């Protein structure tokens, strides 16, 4: 057995729990990545059981990938950055969860994204995935923007683009708005032929469902569709406003992460594009940084 896998060696678990996916990584005390896992949404707004099941599934995959047993879950010093726990009621729910880990240190997905992007140093990060939000920290000054959840916020996010796509397609099908290539793309994707079939598909839609169809907006925009281009530019304006707010405190680095980040970047103003630098590490490794920091504090300390 390697030193990293000995029973008395600390093991760290990093969890990045977003609105669509949950990523887990197990890291040894000497910072070797031992195993990784991937599962479904871990946002408690979707329900505690959904979120905790996703965390446990991703963790079990990471254990298996690392050659560890299920019982080794109790050895893990876990750091979890979850979408939704910026809301006090969900933070309390997760804090009371009877988890199977050695310890669980809880924070937001935005916090671990920033820690990973800048390896724990000052900087700013914007998430453009299922949701949208941003955070900057400079010399102890903290700015957090967004993170209010869909449909109340998350402008410029995957869920927002998917919802706007649906609105525009339905208007076009009713001949209340100009034709758009997005109609053809969505009908093909859903194997639908009319507005009733489209609406039926979305009747129980979650933010993840809407976000799934966001790429269709960009496909149409890249083909020159005027309606899609208008939507992309509107979404880019929302994200640009977040960036300008964060840049107001002059963070030394700005990184974008999330499934739509690379699609939106070309539509952002030049002064923002020039500030963007690649994230140094992914959010799940930011969660490991967080766990390592917090495990040096009293075990009762858990903080956003």
Residue positions per predicted region:
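Glycine/charged-rich beta-loop-alpha catalytic/anionic-binding loops adjacent to active sites
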Residues: 37, 98, 102, 142-149, ...
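Short beta-strand-loop/turn "lid" adjacent to the catalytic site in phosphate-handling enzymes
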Residues: 43, 59, 63-106, 118
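Active-site nucleophile and cofactor-binding loops and adjacent substrate-binding regions
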Residues: 103-112, 127-128, 276-285
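Glycine-rich phosphate-binding loop of actin/hexokinase-like ATP-binding domains
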Residues: 121-172
